[in-house]
């Protein structure tokens, strides 16, 4: 059942906005209402609302004390952010409007401000985002309750009567456009008609209510739902408002938003169920696409090419950080969008790998590793790195097909066609096209280039593993190294090859445990933490400033990382560097 009882969590927002705007003739709409009803949040932080009126006039009359505020004049969007120290709330008002002429598949050519809420509904993307909320203090009839309403009964009454009053939740739902035209003329509640709706005794009461017991004062929660979004929330269907082709051709970003909504909402529902620790055999109903909506998404997939890349990036980032990336990639593939967004990944399909390492093609291995990674790591950049960590194998394996000798293979693996390097190059190309920042791309590339490093550490004997891990920690920091170890675990789990015993991850888990111990006992030890500085080395060895000083500090650091407590002493460092310089001098003489 939907969480109608949680609607009261929206009352403080309604009260706050009433004070700021100076009137209560507005409606919360969109994600805040959807998430409250689904139970995926009790405290939404992004509150979208709408009302009738000219945006400039509304903006002028807002009480701006204690809030940051700005208006986007072209589309009339007004943003209000409370200035409280720990505030994360944002309110965004877009006045009721109608739109025409979406010639660029994104922005309307003309906007008409309106006082018709039913007209505003028609410009919304999906039915589950077109549920409007308001509230009203009034006296309502109280009936003796016979039984609790269930989902089947709720939908039956709504479909027949067009409205229902849920006494337990003090919630009134109205879907009938005929009733709504009388309830909200000019986008303002007609309280007389509201009383009329509550006072009559339709099937909405007869099914589960007995005799009338009088009236009581309540804070009535009102849901205005002409697009029948309640039905789709109950049945977990993503459906466009009106004709799907029209909706997607008006605004092509809706194609990707639709995939993201289904993906992220399902992840939230699964997470909520796990937190409740209910019976693991209980089934959770998850969102799927209404057939015509999905058919339209697939047939209009090429419209994705018309969308501004920064908007695509925003949708992908939300899905990869909040949702199920593995599932999203599957949807993108089925909707023929994968090759548009991630071309290097699409090319890995049907490229077989050496059976002794991988029983699957490159693509299958990659998405399996992504599946395992998302269970242990939520960092969206790490997840994107996992998505591209092996895409360079396409070029590497193409060279293998030329019957190279062992020496030629050795040279290939030492060069740019080694998939650790070529994958990073391909990631840079594809993520730059998606408008990822230079910093984000560098981070993704770093994980790709280093994704074999944990394997290499495990090849060392146990005595040297701690030193190698300290070196990696010194260079990259705890969070990056921990992420690399997660990538390593997921990479191994994605092999599914009994010959490699990939299910035994005890050594990789040992590295994670060792990393935590080093971090807690020693922290990230870097050259600046050495007992000697560059100037000490210059003075001790009578050297001038130059490249050699940095090299000697690196030599010292490499030595000290073997046992920080014992070796980070000036006399030991100088003795080690003296031997190093002596060896250098000998090599130079041999070169002469």
Role assignments for model-derived ranges:
Residues 1-592:
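Catalytic cores of the polymerase beta-like nucleotidyltransferase superfamily
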């Amino acid at each position: 059942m939907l969480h109608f009882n949680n609607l009261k969590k929206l009352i403080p927002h309604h009260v706050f906005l009433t004070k700021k705007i100076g009137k209560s003739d507005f409606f919360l709409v969109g994600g805040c209402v959807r998430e409250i009803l689904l139970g995926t949040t009790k405290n939404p932080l992004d509150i979208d609302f709408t009302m009738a009126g000219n945006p400039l006039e509304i903006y002028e009359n807002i009480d701006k004390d204690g809030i940051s505020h700005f208006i986007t004049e072209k589309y009339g969007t007004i943003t209000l952010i409370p200035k409280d120290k720990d505030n994360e709330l944002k309110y965004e008002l877009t006045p009721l409007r109608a739109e025409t002429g979406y010639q660029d598949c994104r922005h309307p050519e003309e906007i008409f401000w309106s006082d018709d809420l039913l007209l505003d509904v028609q410009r919304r993307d999906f039915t589950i985002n077109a549920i409007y909320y308001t509230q009203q203090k009034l006296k309502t009839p109280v009936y003796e309750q016979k039984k609790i309403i269930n989902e089947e009964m709720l939908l039956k009454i709504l479909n027949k009567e067009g409205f229902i009053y849920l006494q337990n939740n003090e919630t009134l739902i109205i879907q009938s456009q005929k009733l709504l035209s009388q309830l909200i003329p000019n986008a303002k509640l007609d309280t007389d008609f509201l009383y009329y709706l509550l006072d009559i005794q339709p099937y909405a009461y007869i099914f589960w209510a007995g005799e009338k017991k009088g009236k009581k004062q309540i804070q009535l929660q009102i849901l205005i739902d002409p697009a029948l979004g309640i039905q789709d929330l109950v049945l977990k269907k993503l459906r466009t408002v009106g004709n799907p082709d029209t909706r997607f051709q008006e605004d092509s970003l809706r194609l990707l938003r639709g995939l993201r909504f289904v993906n992220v909402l399902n992840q939230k529902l699964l997470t909520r169920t796990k937190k409740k620790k209910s019976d693991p055999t209980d089934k959770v109903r998850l969102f799927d696409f209404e057939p015509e909506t999905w058919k339209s998404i697939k047939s209009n997939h090429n419209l994705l090419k018309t969308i501004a890349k920064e908007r695509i990036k925003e949708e992908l980032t939300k899905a990869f950080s909040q949702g199920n990336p593995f599932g999203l990639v599957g949807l993108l593939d089925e909707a023929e969008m994968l090759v548009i967004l991630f071309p290097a990944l699409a090319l890995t399909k049907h490229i077989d790998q050496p059976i002794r390492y991988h029983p699957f093609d490159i693509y299958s291995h990659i998405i399996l590793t992504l599946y395992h990674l998302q269970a242990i790591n939520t960092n969206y950049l790490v997840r994107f790195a996992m998505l591209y960590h092996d895409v360079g194998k396409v070029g590497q394996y193409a060279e293998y097909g030329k019957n190279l000798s062992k020496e030629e293979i050795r040279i290939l693996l030492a060069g740019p066609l080694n998939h650790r390097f070529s994958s990073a190059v391909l990631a840079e190309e594809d993520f730059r096209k998606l408008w990822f920042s230079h910093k984000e791309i560098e981070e993704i590339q770093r994980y790709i280039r280093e994704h074999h490093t944990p394997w290499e550490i495990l090849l060392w004997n146990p005595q040297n593993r701690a030193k190698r891990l300290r070196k990696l920690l010194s260079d990259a920091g705890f969070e990056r190294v921990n992420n690399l170890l997660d990538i390593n675990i997921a990479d191994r789990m994605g092999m599914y090859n009994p010959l490699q015993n990939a299910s035994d991850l005890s050594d990789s888990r040992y590295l994670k445990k060792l990393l935590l111990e080093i971090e807690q006992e020693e922290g990230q030890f870097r050259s600046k933490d050495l007992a000697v500085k560059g100037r000490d080395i210059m003075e001790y060895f009578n050297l001038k400033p130059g490249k050699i000083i940095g090299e000697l500090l690196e030599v010292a650091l490499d030595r000290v990382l073997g046992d920080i407590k014992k070796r980070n002493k000036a006399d030991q460092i100088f003795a080690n560097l003296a031997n190093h310089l002596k060896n250098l001098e000998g090599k130079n003489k041999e070169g002469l």
